[in-house]
Amino acid sequence: MRLNTIKPGAGSKSAGKRVGRGIGSGLGKTCGRGHKGQKSRAGGFHKVGFEGGQMPLQRRLPKRGFVSLTRGRCAEVRLSELAQLPVEDVDLLVLKQAGVIAADALSAKVVLSGAISKKVVLRGIAATAGARAAIEAAGGSCGE
């Protein structure tokens, strides 16, 4: 096989509709658009959401909710995710670089989900009571 001999599979490609090529084609003269009217004209169609002058649905329904500019960006980290990290000292930057938490997270908290058997030292990261106990049982510490 060579790059210049590759072809699409049989029947996978269909030819485009050829319009305006005579009566016998079934798509001659008016090209399948019918006679007169807005939809037969070039560029003749309403914009998306237009309902003929009736108040459109997106304007009939009320606005709802808002985006809080002060929302807390605290990420949740599982014990099982901590166990997979290649380093022992864990801080916010390490978690971001490993892709465990989002890049815009301002803080993180470790929760008791999964198990951990290796020593981990948390720096500047909060932990729930259960997660703290599991980390300390594995020989690690939570220095906040």
Swiss-Prot record:
Regions that span the bilayer: none
Annotated spans, Disordered: 1-51
A Pfam family it matches: Ribosomal_L27A
Keywords assigned: Ribonucleoprotein, Ribosomal protein, RNA-binding, rRNA-binding
This protein's GO CC annotations: cytosolic large ribosomal subunit
Superkingdom assignment: Bacteria
Gene Ontology annotations of biological process type: translation
Chain intervals with Gly residues compositional bias: 21-31
Keyword RNA-binding among record annotations: yes
Signal peptide: none
GO molecular function, one term: rRNA binding
Family: Belongs to the universal ribosomal protein uL15 family.
Oligomer status and interactors: Part of the 50S ribosomal subunit.
HAMAP family with a match to the protein in the record: Ribosomal_uL15 (MF_01341)
Function: Binds to the 23S rRNA.
UniProt protein name: Large ribosomal subunit protein uL15
Organism expressing this protein natively: Azoarcus sp. (strain BH72)
